[in-house]
Every structure is written in C-alpha cells, then in structure tokens.
C-alpha cells in the first residue's frame, strides 16, 4: 500500500459549511484587488468544500504547509489561506473554474508525492547537500529576501543521485515517488516557502538562482535534462505565483536558445519568462548588493561572507508552519499503520 497522508476532520465527511467571504478584500494584504477580482476570489474560496470533495483524498487539505479548508476549521488561518488561493487564481488569469481544477490537481499531487516529507523528513545522498542552499536577508529587497541557490556545477555522480529514491530494495510500504534528485529539489522549494509570509507584500515570494558554472552544456547528463523538464512541469503546475525573479547565471551565450524553446513549447508562460534574468557571469550585486554576497557572486569584492555556505549559515532560524508539523506526524502514523497491515 502506498503512503498517503490522512488529515483528521471533525466528521468523516468534508465540511460543506459556507465560507464567509464577505470581507475577503480585507484579508488580502499582498496586493490591491479590483471589485471583480475580489468577487472571483470569493467564488473560489466558497468552492473549497467542492474542491476537496473532488480530490482523491478529501481529507488532505494542505498546501505549502497551511490548511486549505473552511473558516471554522481549527487549523485554518483565513488570511494565509486566501492569499494562497489568490496565487492559484492569478496564475489562471482569474478564471475560477480553471483555478479550481488546478487546486484539485495540486492537492492530489501533494497527497501522493508528499513534498513536506521530502523537505523535512527524508535523507538524501550527501552530494545533493552540495547542490543547493537557502539564503536569507530579512532586510533585503522586496520579495528577494529569501533565495534558493542551485549549483549544478557541483554534480559529480549523476548516476547515483538520479536513482529512484530509497533504491531498488526499498519496501513498497511507504515508498516515495521520484528520484533522489527530484525529491531533494522539491524539498528545497518547500523549505524556502516556509520563510515566506504570504500576507506580506514584500515577502510573499522568493527568488531563485541557477548557477551553471563548470557545467558542460554540450555534455549534460541526459538524466539532468529529463529531471529539469520534470521539475519545470511540477513547479509550473503546483507552485504558482511564488517566484519574484529567477536568475540563470554563468550561462554560455549560445544557451539563449533554451529560453526561446521553453516559450515556444508553452512549457513556461510568457508572464513567468518575464521574471527570468539570464547572465553570462555570476555578478548579482545589482539585485542583492555587493555586501550581501560572497566574492564569487558580487564581482570579486571582499565581504564578510567567505562563501555561499557562510551566507546560508547567517540566515535567521525559523520554524515551519504548525499545520505542516501536523501533516508530517499524521503521515508517519499512516506509514506505521500500513507497515503493520503488510506484516499481518
């Protein structure tokens, strides 16, 4: 039996209580909404019980570590829930029906893939720990306070990290979807989102840096290419309106065709492509300030940060969302139950 998270509700059925959406506009702090946009958000909020009923597991109501359910559910933070729903609505250009479908699909994906487990519970090959870090500066520019760094040039053993998570010998009970690399990469994304405050206009999105230094584009491992395509698809479908900017640095000039290809194939929307910054060097001083970066990323200037790792270590500590902890605990309990059943 594959592992799924089961979230306890007051009753066995999903609540059909009408959500109070009369003051939706007052709960949204991340942006100004028009009257029409507020009306559509109210409709999406009111459709939450319907959305949950349409999922494979109606009891699973978590997105980005927060509860997506009716107002009276004890785990719901109404403001955060509304901000998350707004991101889905914006991504689908305020088409309520399309946003509802996306939410159903995302809840199904999260229930099956378990991204919170990938972020906080699973252990990966040590090499993967060298491929990415999260850095933070609470005083940084708007929606660039927290950054995920992807350091592809440090990948030395692609065959190993692109194996199925857990290896071929892992029990089917509690087995996880995807390769080590995929689960690690999704986990980094989930961790970075825990630093965001969806109700703060200056910190409701994160930034990403993809460093291609020492990467041979012509001899890139086919597994890397396949996983990159898969990650782009997953992020596009399940992580809407969460990136403020995406830097591609130390990119060979001739690789510009990649971004034209992504746009032509419709893999990434034109709106998302506007957030891309493609640099043939690694100097990010213009966006983050030279004093907030190690020399390798600020044009060679000396700073208090000797390395990217030192910058990551300086990131303020924080706690993950309370509901994420609840989901993780219940997932563990479900694994134990499934294991006992398989033994019986």
Swiss-Prot record:
Q: Which InterPro entries does the UniProt entry name for this protein?
A: CRAL-TRIO_dom, CRAL-TRIO_dom_sf, CRAL/TRIO_N_dom_sf, Sfh5
Role of this protein:
Non-classical phosphatidylinositol (PtdIns) transfer protein (PITP), which exhibits PtdIns-binding/transfer activity in the absence of detectable PtdCho-binding/transfer activity. Regulates PtdIns(4,5)P2 homeostasis at the plasma membrane. Heme-binding protein that may play a role in organic oxidant-induced stress responses.
Q: How does it sit in the membrane?
A: Peripheral membrane protein
- Pfam families annotated for this entry? CRAL_TRIO
Tell me if Ligase is a UniProt keyword of this record.
no
Protein name in the entry: Phosphatidylinositol transfer protein SFH5
Protein origin, superkingdom? Eukaryota
- Stored PROSITE patterns: CRAL_TRIO
| Region forming the signal peptide | none
Any GO BP? Golgi to plasma membrane protein transport
Cofactors that this protein relies on: heme b
What keywords tag this UniProt record?
Answer: Cytoplasm, Endoplasmic reticulum, Heme, Iron, Lipid transport, Membrane, Metal-binding, Microsome, Transport
Which family, according to UniProt?
Answer: Belongs to the SFH5 family.
Which source organism does the UniProt entry give?
Answer: Debaryomyces hansenii (strain ATCC 36239 / CBS 767 / BCRC 21394 / JCM 1990 / NBRC 0083 / IGC 2968) (Yeast)
Reactions catalysed, semicolon-separated, are: a 1,2-diacyl-sn-glycero-3-phospho-(1D-myo-inositol)(in) = a 1,2-diacyl-sn-glycero-3-phospho-(1D-myo-inositol)(out)
Q: Show the taxonomic lineage.
A: Eukaryota, Fungi, Dikarya, Ascomycota, Saccharomycotina
């Amino acid at each position: 039996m594959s592992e799924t998270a089961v979230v306890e509700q007051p009753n066995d059925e999903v609540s059909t209580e009408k959500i109070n959406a009369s003051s939706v506009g007052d709960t949204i702090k991340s942006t100004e909404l028009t009257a029409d946009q507020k009306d559509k958000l109210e409709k999406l909020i009111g459709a939450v019980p319907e959305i949950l009923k349409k999922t494979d597991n109606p009891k699973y109501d978590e997105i980005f570590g927060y509860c997506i359910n009716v107002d009276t559910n004890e785990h719901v933070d109404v403001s955060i829930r509304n901000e998350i729903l707004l991101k889905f609505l914006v991504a689908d250009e305020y088409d309520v029906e399309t946003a509802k479908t996306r939410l159903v699909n995302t809840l199904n994906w999260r229930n099956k893939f378990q991204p919170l487990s990938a972020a906080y519970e699973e252990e990966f090959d040590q090499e993967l720990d060298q491929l990415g870090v999260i850095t933070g500066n609470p005083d940084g520019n708007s929606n660039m306070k927290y950054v995920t760094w992807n350091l592809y040039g440090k990948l030395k053993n692609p065959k190993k990290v692109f194996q199925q998570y857990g290896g071929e010998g892992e029990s089917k009970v509690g087995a996880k979807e995807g390769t080590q690399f995929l689960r690690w990469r999704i986990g980094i994304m989930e961790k970075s989102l825990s630093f965001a405050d969806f109700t703060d206009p200056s910190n409701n999105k994160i930034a990403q840096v993809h460093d291609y230094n020492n990467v041979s584009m012509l001899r890139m491992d086919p597994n890397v290419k396949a996983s990159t395509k898969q990650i782009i698809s997953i992020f596009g479908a399940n992580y809407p309106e969460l990136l403020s900017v995406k830097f591609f640095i130390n990119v060979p000039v001739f690789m510009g065709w990649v971004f034209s290809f992504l746009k032509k194939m419709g893999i990434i929307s034109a709106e998302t492509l506007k957030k891309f910054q493609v640099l043939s060097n690694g100097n990010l001083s213009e966006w983050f300030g030279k004093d907030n970066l190690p020399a390798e990323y600020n044009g060679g200037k000396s700073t208090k940060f000797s390395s990217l790792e030192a910058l990551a270590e300086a990131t303020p500590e924080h706690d993950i969302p309370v509901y994420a902890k609840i989901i993780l605990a219940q997932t563990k309990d479900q694994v134990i139950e499934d294991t006992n059943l398989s033994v019986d």
